[in-house]
């Protein structure tokens, strides 16, 4: 058990603003016994006026020198709190249990993936891409389908059966009708949860329902594209009434699946089930047209797997080309976002001679004739 010295506090970074860090202190440091002498207390306050629940902190120079970054979600030790000014200094970053790069969050426990069953309609390919991206994080995935009041119970059952075959048990909710919001709250209790999903599905509205006093900006769905406008600009943790922290992330439509081709198959629960009872003939099988493959078959998302695999192979090839300057191929970008590999010309062989070099050559020739 860690022992903290006098003047040290433990907390969680809930927001990063330039070189400042908003730290939410643990509950036990806000007890009446931890107040300094002479500090006034209002009896009708739910918590003592001092110490504060949040401190705006800087990072110690020592941490900067050793390159220790501070992320949202980090558990940190705060020294020398200035209760009057609401300031402090981060002296230490405790070891991280998990770490996400995009969005940059530490110590997250699970991902709450929010989609809508209507307005915008549920797109299987887009949902599959988000699910694979969520699986790559190694966190637990909770699938939540909003706007369930817009479809019939029969349609809900069809969607549920389909997603069960994918390996996921969806939870149908409606923020507008307050359907199953309490069930979502149970999943989030005492955990750090990352909320993800495309724009326009009701993520911000759901967070507003879970934390009524947060008042996140809510974007309407664009009529032209049937997609929501981006309403979340940065990553921040918000405290839930029943314990736990919620991280809202910037909305985006198609996340990158940035895993290796060999790893991809393990991010499909259906494929994992097949590999649990059988093995492929080849250890490096990519489950396309190899003989005696245990994964290839008639499961619904197999076509999604092949498309994501092609993307992963193309990405890996591009990384290899960028890392090898002596490569004989180069990636050339075409119009409309398309790209292709072309033979690389020999360096300097086809370069036009500069005018300066031509003049110098003429001067040398003139001097030789003299």
From Swiss-Prot:
InterPro entries: G_CP_dom, NA-bd_OB-fold, P-loop_NTPase, Ribosome_biogen_GTPase_RsgA, RsgA_GTPase_dom. Residues 328-370 are annotated as: Disordered. Binds 1 zinc ion per subunit. Residues 97-255 form the CP-type G domain. CDD domains: YjeQ_EngC. Keywords: Cytoplasm, GTP-binding, Hydrolase, Metal-binding, Nucleotide-binding, Ribosome biogenesis, RNA-binding, rRNA-binding, Zinc. Disulfide bonds: none annotated. It is found in: Cytoplasm. Its EC number is 3.6.1.-. GTP binds at residues 146-149, 197-205. Its main location: cytoplasm. It comes from the Bacteria. GO terms for molecular function: GTP binding; GTPase activity; metal ion binding; rRNA binding. Zn(2+) binds at residues 280, 285, 287, 293. Belongs to the TRAFAC class YlqF/YawG GTPase family. RsgA subfamily. Monomer. Associates with 30S ribosomal subunit, binds 16S rRNA. This is Small ribosomal subunit biogenesis GTPase RsgA. It comes from Trichormus variabilis (strain ATCC 29413 / PCC 7937). The gene is rsgA.
């Amino acid at each position: 058990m860690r022992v903290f010295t006098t003047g040290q506090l433990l907390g969680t970074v809930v927001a990063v603003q330039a070189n400042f860090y908003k730290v939410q202190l643990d509950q036990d440091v806000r007890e009446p016994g931890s107040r300094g002498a002479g500090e006034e207390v209002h009896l009708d306050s739910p918590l003592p006026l001092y110490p504060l629940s949040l401190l705006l902190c800087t990072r110690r120079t020592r941490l900067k020198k050793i390159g220790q970054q501070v992320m949202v979600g980090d558990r940190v030790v705060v020294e020398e709190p200035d209760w009057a000014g609401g300031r402090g200094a981060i002296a230490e970053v405790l070891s991280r249990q998990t770490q996400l790069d995009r969005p940059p969050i530490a110590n997250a426990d699970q991902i709450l993936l929010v989609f809508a069953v209507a307005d915008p309609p549920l797109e299987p390919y887009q949902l599959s891409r988000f699910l694979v991206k969520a699986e790559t994080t190694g966190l637990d995935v909770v699938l939540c389908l909003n706007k369930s009041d817009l479809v019939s119970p029969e349609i809900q059952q069809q969607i549920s059966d389909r997603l069960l075959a994918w390996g996921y048990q969806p939870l149908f909710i409606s923020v507008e009708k307050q359907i199953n919001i309490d069930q979502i709250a149970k999943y989030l209790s005492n955990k750090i949860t990352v909320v993800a999903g495309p724009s326009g599905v009701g993520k911000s509205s759901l967070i507003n329902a879970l934390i009524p006093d947060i008042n996140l900006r809510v974007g309407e769905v664009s009529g032209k594209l049937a997609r929501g406008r981006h309403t979340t600009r940065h990553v921040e943790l918000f405290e839930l009434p029943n314990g736990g922290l919620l991280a809202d992330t910037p909305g985006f439509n198609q996340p990158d699946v940035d895993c290796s081709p060999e790893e991809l198959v393990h991010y499909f629960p259906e494929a994992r089930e097949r590999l649990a009872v059988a093995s492929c003939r080849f250890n490096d099988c990519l489950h396309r047209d190899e003989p005696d493959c245990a994964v290839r078959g008639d499961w619904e998302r197999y076509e999604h797997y092949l498309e994501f695999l092609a993307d992963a192979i193309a990405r890996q090839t591009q990384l290899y080309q960028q890392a090898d300057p002596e490569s004989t191929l180069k990636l050339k970008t075409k119009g409309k976002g398309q790209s292709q590999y072309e033979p690389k010309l020999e360096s300097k062989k086809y370069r036009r001679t500069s005018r300066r070099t031509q003049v110098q050559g003429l001067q040398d020739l003139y001097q030789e004739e003299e």
